[in-house]
Amino acid sequence: MNNDQFFTIKIVILTFILLSIKYLVSYSINFDEDIFFKILRLSESDFLEYAQMVEGLSNFNLKFDWSIKQPAEKIQSFPIFSFVWHAAIFNLFGYYSFIFLEFFLYFLLLFIFLKVITFIQNDKQIAFFSLVFLLFFLELIIFLMNNYDLYFLHKIKLPLYEIFSHRFPRPLVTSVYFFSILYFIFKIIKSKVSKVKNKFFLLLGFSFAFLINSFFYLSITCLLTLILFLILEFKKKIFYFINLNKYGFIILFFLILFGLSTIFLQTTFSEPTHFFRMGGFEISSIEKLHIAKIFFKKLFQVEILLLIIFSFLIKLNYDKLKILKKNQTYYDFLFYFFLCSFISPLIFLLFSNKVIALNNFWTTVKFSGFFYIYLVFVNFLFNNYLKNKINFIS
């Protein structure tokens, strides 16, 4: 058995342990309860609403129409690419498909996440330790929140849980798209100024298209970071690199355009009141300025100031933190991602007159800052204190 196979088996075991516990405990308490009711009871509070959307989409019903007396006249504008995989197999397994896909997609999320941090840290031992430690940290926070009423735990948990948990559909589905984007960007970056296989642009384009439809706010930060990083990384050679990979960039452009067009079509042909019933609202230019001021004030929150200060200190002290030169490019990408997460909401406000759940932008800010600092911290901890004491791979 080679390292990659062993690597995959470890992720399978980790996934099974994390997801099966709730079902095993439930069966030990109430063995006779049907698995169908366990799926409903052990899921998040909004699961049933999303499950009904999946059932509707599986029958090619984009109206998600549940009322006989008051049928919908147009389609709904909810992001269908976050449901598409569940809808594809719903007719085969019904509600039991949610269990199968919960295990499979969470495995895929952990697997791709590990691939991403292996790229960044260039060491499978450190990467696997980073993954396990992060999962343990998240589970510990959830446990403490269930037993102690500590507000600061909620502030720590939220950005992690919104990007790295098995809640359906976000982040169970959307984070697979997100980390796929990071992975394929890193594959392209690795080539330096040389020809990149078009398949990486194709896969990156599909990942972008799916994320644009499923979690538009996060896709803005991803796209903005990609553009900024290519400019800063390749500098004067940027046009040479684009010309060298022109067909790949054309593929990427049209797939991103496809993702944007799905949102446009859904918005154009959807029920006009659905957006407002989901908590959205229209804003004027004056209200945009007011929202921008609120975002600016948030910069002075203690946790945000700490993330900014530590991120810049890390960026300026790579050598002292024992980050190898060959790995610094990938850490830089995470640093720029953190910076772009501050700019993304302003760009969105500039072009959009409709907003909904703007707090998701701030979730991205907190997660990206934490993610950058966390990986540097684990790299430093492992190389200085744990490298000869812990072996996760062999």
Question: What positions do the PLM features span?
Answer:
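Short aromatic-rich membrane-water interface segments that cap or initiate transmembrane helices
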Residues: L42, K157-R170, S284-V302, T363
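Membrane-interface transmembrane helices that cradle and orient dolichyl/undecaprenyl
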Residues: V173-F200
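Active-site lumenal/periplasmic loops and adjacent helix-entry segments of GT-C-fold
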Residues: S20-F179, N213-I220
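Signature aromatic-anchored transmembrane alpha helix within multi-pass, membrane-resident enzymes
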Residues: K246-I256, N379-S394
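Membrane-interface alpha helices of multi-pass inner-membrane proteins
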Residues: K199-F216
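Hydrophobic/aromatic-rich transmembrane helices and adjacent perimembrane loops
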Residues: I220-C222, K354-Y385
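Transmembrane catalytic cores of multi-pass membrane glycosyltransferases
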Residues: D46, N213-K326, D332-F335, L339-L346, ...
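Start-transfer (signal-anchor) and selected internal transmembrane alpha helices
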Residues: M1-E33, Q121-L131, F249-L252, Q328, ...
